[in-house]
Amino acid sequence: MSDHVTRRLRIHGRVQGVWYRESMRLKADALGVSGWVRNRMDGTVEALVQGPFEAVDTLTAWARRGPEDAEVTAVDIAEESAPPMGRFEKRPTA
């Protein structure tokens, strides 16, 4: 799995109430990326994304824009290691 990568993303800005999580789930599914996305109580969106480097890089670039109604101001990115994950899912707010 050396060509695979796992990243934790924290997305800041107007990213809740704009279909960010569902849009990210659809984009991740289209790219073949595994993981999850959830709202955070502080108003950010958090995601753990895993898959081939190029696909994760494409999803990370998408996260900087988000869906049409989002206004992303920053994305914190951390490389992580994690066991293989299944399909991409929306999780409850944490």
List each model region and its residues.
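Intrinsically disordered, low-complexity, mixed-charge
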Residues: 1-94
